[in-house]
A protein has these predicted regions:
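A conserved loop-to-beta-strand element in the N-lobe of protein kinase catalytic cores
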Residues: 190-199, 203, 207-208
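A short, aromatic-enriched beta-strand patch in the conserved N-lobe beta-sheet
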Residues: 185-187
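Domain-scale recognition of modular recruitment/scaffold domains used in eukaryotic signaling
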Residues: 1-138
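Regulatory alphaC helix of protein kinase catalytic domains
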Residues: 165-170
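Glycine-rich ATP phosphate-binding loop
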Residues: 141-159
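Catalytic-loop of the protein kinase fold
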Residues: 238-255
Length: 384
């Protein structure tokens, strides 16, 4: 039977680093360094880590206090999950050991190979030629490359496979809209090295593009078209009951014809089948609707709020939102009614849309269908 909380021989110092910022009741069990054969139960509580020796008795049973005795560690953990019984807190959430993580990821890897092959997006490594690096990220680097003569972006993972990234690839494989960056294929083989191929976006991300040009090089009509491209991509997501959850200019890329496309679907999910939040999921406060930050529930209406922030970014030429407000104070300001002023020289028609997207009542915000119509109307009537 698997014991995901059993971490083997790790030091007290390493344990305290692992548990340092975890919630009360988070725990793991490690082999005792001072008493061979014994274990140590390590438990997070009020910002500290408590260490309890688990004694191995002569009858091969285990105990923390010589009163409650258990035939194995599994029953010991089950007992202290029901009742703290002398501990500082009952056991709540285990920290999964690296061995279990690796086992799960290897199983996931093999399953994904079968899944991607059936979907027709599994790519042979010999058909991919990798060129110069064009971007660096926390989880990997991005290279320019070619797949069967087609120019592509090749994402290479730094630390082997990650289930999060394979999940993102699966999500992207279901998308089909001109304003969403397209998945070309996934390279997975016996080497356990993973590459994800997407369409090549020659003009990079929208933040860098806007900052390098500025208001004197870009006409307002071009800015509005960027916004309409994004709204159209999100109209497709909305129609398919999908939410992006990380909509921001940094995740908007421009192709060779300066068409804006939404990228980075690492946090995206179905409204009907929401995923549980993993520890790697940190939502960007300045772009996320307050009700989503409070409840953890995301809808198309929360994406609409984020789209309003994108409008502000576009017409401020990629300034950081909520300037001069500390990030820890942003939510409080919004809940008290504060909204950003429109950027300098922003058309009234655009600032009116921003105001609608930031309505405190999600039901009063426009849909992406309505936003597309508004932007198309602004372009047609030259309301800029």
């Amino acid at each position: 039977m698997q014991m995901p909380w059993l971490h083997g021989k790790i030091s007290r110092e390493r344990t305290e680093k692992i548990l340092a910022t975890t919630a009360n009741g988070t725990f793991l069990i490690r082999e005792s360094t001072n008493y061979p054969g014994d274990y140590t139960l390590c438990l997070s509580f009020d910002g500290k880590v408590e260490h309890y020796r688990i004694h191995l008795l002569e009858n091969s049973h285990y105990t923390c206090d010589h009163e409650a005795v258990f035939p194995n560690l599994i029953q010991l953990v089950a007992h202290y999950k029901r009742d703290a019984d002398g501990l500082c807190h009952e056991l709540v959430s285990p920290v999964i050991s690296e061995n279990i993580k690796n086992h799960l990821e290897n199983s996931n890897f093999d399953a994904k190979i079968v899944e991607f092959r059936k979907a027709g997006i599994l790519v042979n490594r010999k058909d991919v030629k990798v060129g110069e690096i064009i971007g660096r990220g926390e989880f990997g680097d991005v290279f320019a490359g070619f797949f069967l003569g087609q120019k592509v972006a090749v994402k290479s993972l730094k630390n082997g496979i990650t289930s999060d990234l394979l999940t993102e690839a699966k999500f992207m494989s279901q998308l089909n809209n001109v304003h969403l960056v397209a998945l070309i294929g996934v390279v997975m083989d016996g080497t356990r090295e993973v590459n994800i191929l997407t369409e090549f976006m020659a003009n990079g991300n929208l933040v860098d593009f806007l900052r390098s040009r500025g208001r004197y090089q870009l006409e307002k009509i071009q800015l509005i078209k960027f916004a309409l491209n994004v709204a159209d991509g999100m109209r497709y997501m909305e129609a398919n009951r999908l939410v992006h959850r990380d909509l921001a200019c940094r995740n908007i890329l421009l192709d060779e014809a300066y068409c804006a496309k939404i990228s980075d679907f690492g946090l995206a999910q179905s409204v009907d089948n929401p995923t549980t939040q993993s520890k790697s999921q940190f939502f960007p406060i300045k772009w996320t609707a307050v009700e989503a930050l409070r409840s953890g529930v995301f809808t198309s209406q929360t994406d609409v709020w984020s789209f309003g922030v994108i409008l502000w970014e576009i017409f401020s030429f990629a300034r950081i939102p909520y300037p001069r407000i500390l990030i820890q104070d942003v939510v409080r300001h919004i809940e008290q009614g504060y909204r950003m002023e429109p950027p300098e020289d922003c058309p009234v028609s655009i600032s009116n849309i921003m105001t609608k997207t930031w309505d405190s009542n999600p039901e009063n915000r426009p849909t992406f269908v309505q936003l597309c119509r508004m932007l198309e109307d602004i372009i047609a009537k030259k309301l800029y």
